[in-house]
Every structure is written in structure tokens, then in C-alpha cells.
């Protein structure tokens, strides 16, 4: 039997192909370029490739008419929602690469209130030798040699490639492959912190083990759905479910599939990895995971729920109700007791997953549009917040180790007012205070949910937002209205690109709170999934 050659729509796949090509080029650069050239080459490849891919997304989006097109024998759906999410992932990637590249652990006191980064290549906050045992002679030798872990950039681009395919997947097998491609590099990058190596490696191990379990659940769910419907394509599953009378096997498959997706977004009760991983991973990687991974994972969840599961609407909606309520409640209540800023932001991200699920549960175009807007607003605020947390270093400045202990942040805003004001802006956005992007995004998802009859869910969300305001304001009060102590940390001086990226995050957070209509209109136009 002669199999026909598949028709590959290279134009529609251009953004994804560009990112994967950059990742492959980065691997080749690691293999063949001299060590002294690798850092500059990798940063240029990552930033340039992400920018070119973003341009490709815009070009493809301008050529899309109607609901979109299927590519590669229906395995990939290129529609407005996919391109919107891919563009968001690429914007986050550009900022994340800047924070990774310009980050340095070697600091020297220049003024009483500032630590200036030494004029050395970046990546000094990442271990020089990932395979070395912490504290071993091999690690010390790598440090003396000035080694840098430039493999970080191709790993990040491979993960970005998976993130771009994940929300575009139109069949479950492609979705599983994309899930693994985006996850495996993240497992490695979580364990690359120079300081607190054991904590970082513990975080990577926990993430890997729990991620492997969730992937197994996902794959088993795929098998059950295939057995129940005879197809792996999302439209095919929808049509088969609509024609069936016995949904027991399909429901079991959907439940197992949901475990994998809800683990990746960090919903309760699949959130246990988030606090440890966010605290132990290098802070630029934490910001990258907290923003980009959520965008990709929610894109995949939206596609499964809106394209494949309309016939099971009455079955999955009550389950997501319960998960959203648990996620908002557990995330908010647990964050109140945190004394480490990174762990507080981790539990805060869990609560935000519940808010975003509120938009998903609406199951209408308004809910889809509100969810897309929320993901954009949350991504910029999250990247900015973690970028600033990564600049706060211990009072003695030794090795440039971060100090995320909230009790040490007393008076930090008085010592470094610009940093304090910017972080306060991001925290107020997380709390949903008016004139910030967080207020508009929460209002959008709550309004969509209320219009779909989920008023009790909205009430829980509003109460959770009110409680969450406490621990955000607590950080602001500590920075500006508490006297300095001897443990008050210093703020490292970021590079020019990092300053620009943080400024962009701040401006976007404010502009989306004051004049959100252009992005809301863009999200409305993007709220079309290929069915």
C-alpha cells in the first residue's frame, strides 16, 4: 500500500517552525562554537528568533479569514485564538530571555542602597556545571574557569516551541507530544540555580516526578477516549460523543485527561508542586514558567473544553465549578500565611488559576475573550513581579543570593523607591485594584461567568479577591511603612534591557487598567476556535 505524502502548510506553521529552528541552531552552536562566543550567539539567536516568530504570527494572523485553518492533516489548528496565545507566549519569551541573559550573581556594593552588577557575562545566577555535585571540586573548578550554562537558551526555545504547539493541537496525540516538549526542558531549567543548589535540585526532582505522573494520567485518558470514540481529533471526538448514548468510558477518559491539563495550569488539588518549584527554581525561570506555561496550558484546556467536549457540557461544568472554587479558596487562604515572597506569589498564582477557570466555565464567546485578555494581563504582571524579586539581594551582598524573606523587606521601598513602586503596581494588579490590568481582567471573567449563570462562582471569586488584597498590601506596607532593619536587602542594578523589559511590564499593567479597550477588542476578535 502506498501512503500519500502529507501536505504541509509551511506558511501557517511558520511561527512554530522558526522557534524550533532557533532551538536546533542553539544546540548546534553549543556543539561547534568556541566557548567565548556561545553566550552572545545564544542570546542573539533566542531574542532574534523570538522576534522573527512574533512577526510571523502577526503576518499569519492578518491572512486568516473566518474561523481558521487546519494544518498537517488536521493535527494543528491555526485560528485566531491560537495566534493570540502564541503571540502572548512569544512576548513573554522575549522578556524572559532578557532577564535570563542579563542576570548576574556577582555583585559589588557601590552605594549604600544599590548593588551594581559586575561587567561580566550574564547567567551567573545559574550553576556553571549542572552535572556537578553541589559543593564538589568539579563545581568549584567550573566556577574558577568562569563557565556559563549557555545551554539554557536552546532549552528555553525548545520549551517555547512546545508551548506554541500545545494550544494549537487539534488532536490528542499532538497535544501529548507538545506537552512533553514544553515540560522536559523546564524540568532541567528548574535545577540550574547557582545558589541553594540542593533546593533547586529538589524542586526539579519534584516537578519531574509529579509531571511524569500527570503525563501518564493524560496519556491514559487519551487511550480511553480513543477507545470510546475511535478517533484522536478533537472535532471527531465531539461528533462521536454526540452520537453515543453510553458515555461512561468517555467520561473516565475526560477525567484522566483533565488531570494532566489541570496539573499544568496548577489547579487544586494538582497544585502541590507549585510552591516548592517556584521557590527553588532560578527566579527568571520561575517567571517564565508562571507566565508562559499558564498561557499555553489554558490554551490547550480551552480547545479541549470548547471543541471536543460540548456534548458533555452538563458533566464537566459542575466538576470545573468545584475545582475553580477550591483553587481560589485554597490559593488565597494559603498565601495569607506565607513569609517568603516567592512562595506567596506561587500560591497567588494558584488563586489566579481559579479566577481564569471562572472564564473557562462561562463556556461562551465572552468567557473565551475574557480568558484570553486575563492571560495577557496576568503574564505581564507576573513577569515584572518576578523580575523585581530577582533583583532583591541579601544585605551582605554575598554571592548575590536573593533574599525573598518578607521579614527582611522592611523599608525596602524607602531605600529603593522606584523598585518599590513598580513591585507595588504589580501587586495591586494581582489584587484587582481599579486602574490596573488586574481589575479589568477580573471584571471581564466575572461578568462572563455571571452572564452564564455562574453567580455563586463569581461571589466566591470576589470574596477571594478581597482576602487576597491583604497579603499583597502587607508586602507594600512592609516596604514603605516599616522601619529598616539591619537585614534589609539591597537591590541589584539591572542591565539596560532588563530595565526596559520591567518598564514595559509596568506600562502594560497600567495601560490595560486605564485604556484596555484595544486589547479587549483584539481578544474579542481572537475568540474563535476552529471547530
Curated annotation (Swiss-Prot):
Its EC number is 7.1.1.-. It is found in: Cell membrane. Keywords: Cell membrane, Membrane, NAD, Quinone, Translocase, Transmembrane, Transmembrane helix, Transport. The keyword Membrane applies. It holds the Pfam family Proton_antipo_M. It comes from the Bacteria. It catalyses: a quinone + NADH + 5 H(+)(in) = a quinol + NAD(+) + 4 H(+)(out). The chain crosses the membrane at residues 8-28, 41-61, 81-101, 146-166, 172-192, 208-228, 250-270, 282-302, 318-338, 350-370, 372-392, 418-438, 453-473, 500-520. GO terms for molecular function: NADH dehydrogenase (ubiquinone) activity; NADH:ubiquinone reductase (non-electrogenic) activity; quinone binding. One of its GO terms (biological process) is ATP synthesis coupled electron transport. One of its GO terms (cellular component) is extracellular region. It is a multi-pass membrane protein. Its main location: membrane. The keyword Cell inner membrane does not apply. Belongs to the complex I subunit 2 family. HAMAP family: NDH1_NuoN_1. PANTHER family: NADH DEHYDROGENASE (PTHR22773). NDH-1 shuttles electrons from NADH, via FMN and iron-sulfur (Fe-S) centers, to quinones in the respiratory chain. The immediate electron acceptor for the enzyme in this species is believed to be a menaquinone. Couples the redox reaction to proton translocation (for every two electrons transferred, four hydrogen ions are translocated across the cytoplasmic membrane), and thus conserves the redox energy in a proton gradient. NCBIfam families: NDH_I_N, PRK05777.1-4. This is NADH-quinone oxidoreductase subunit N.
